[in-house]
Amino acid sequence: MKGTGMRLGPTGVAVAVALVAAAVVYAPRAWVSDLGPMPDAGEYATSARNLAHLRGFVIELLGRDYPPRYPPGFPLLLAPVFWLPGATLASAIYVVAAFAVLAVLLTHALARRLGGPVAGLLAAGALLLRTVFVDWSHQVMSETATVATATAIAVLLHHRAQHAGDARRHASLVTIGLVCGVAILMRYTNLVFVPAVAIALLVDARVRASPWRSAIALGTGPALALGVLALDDHVTFGSVARTGYHYWVPYWHTSLAKTFSLAYAVRQPGDAALGAFGGSPNLIYYGAYILLNVSSAWFALAAAWGAAVLVRRGNAGTRTVVVYAAALTTFLYLTYGFYFYQSGRFMAPLIGVFAAVTGAGVADALRRLGRYRELSLRTVTLAGTACLLALVGPIVEMRAVAGRTYIVRRLVLGASEPAIAQPMSAAVAAYEQTVPRGAVVVTALPLTMLDSVVKRGIRVVGLARTSYWASPQLERDPVFPERAEEIARSIESGIPVYTDAYSLSVTPTDPRYGPARAALKKFRLRPVETTRPTRLYRLDVD
């Protein structure tokens, strides 16, 4: 008698996918205590903590409250974690990781709808093998939440096209619109989700038959989100057309022509990204980023194969998803192609949908190769190459992903220290434990991390006009080169002045710290013993 064996149903498979995803993206607070790219990550975390404690939607700099640069959507999602006992700023990473797991589950669900169970598993694996996605999961930034919303929209579009009857059509559009609204509350430019969805919906003849009713249903969520943002901007900045970007970075937001320009697209960006293709024209940079990071050199052919297969199938669900993916890619590419600031993070919404299409492509190629009697030379060449690249890709990418995974680093390799050093949070902790009240700290640490130091009665002086120090809001607060003589007199009068190893490490590599380097030459630096894995220095004068 043959045994039936154990088979997981769809729910069991989804649970297994979620567990694997959690194992890949999880990181304890100590390993991510520097939060992510500053000042953005610090601003998200501090504003969320203040919302949770009913202090208002503010950030604290030098003991004063200021409005944040970013809209309130993502901090509102982070806020509940700060109700937990013992929560720190780094606790926000658990919400980020939860959205990363949700994004993987939605990618799996979308690919399963497009190409079957195998496609779902392949898509989830493709997403978890994207090193940028794992990196985003370890930073207190909005990328994983944006990936989840963009992929959720694709799942809802497919479900609506395949299953929703006339009675549920209106409700499904309202739901999609509400998800778009949540995305807009997190990032202003997520407004491009709305036209991408609208174009995808035109595939459905029922939408074309009642365009106004469909537009109202879809537009409810975005309209509510824009209303909330407009009210917040009006109350905070005095105008619905003025945002936190105008407040903190007025140079780039003095006019629409300054923020968006053809020159950024075809010559060079106003503010270039680091890494490969950074500083190249935006159209080149984002094209390369989509090909090499959102997809990859290993998965690009499989993604193209998957898109072609889905178009040929001709059913409403697959066509809607492909049109949505193409429209969203186009709108994001063009919007940020003309934008002054260059960052691959802006392409994050695409990564889940691309992984789903990749999974569908590889699954279809495997099925075709399995029907060996029907194979043509063209099928063998294209499908075989797509499968081979998709097989080699994980082998190549696995090492990089493993190096970013806590379980591998800690349990397999035995690492007891964070995989990536957290020098900023270590320096803050050293200041809190070592520096006495009334002392002065000269530092390049982000101001959003220094609130606890300021509250201890320690005066903070920036090393250079960078980040918040460069904004008009802090122009009356002198930085170190402007205050060097005063600090020397303070030292002579017995006031201790300190700096930290992190700040000294960034000054030689950043030209903006040139005046600070010159001013520091007038002082002697004496190491100070601390209980933290970092070093502080006390400034002295001859």
Predicted regions and their residues:
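Hydrophobic, aromatic-rich transmembrane alpha-helices
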Residues: 202, 207, 282-319, 329, ...
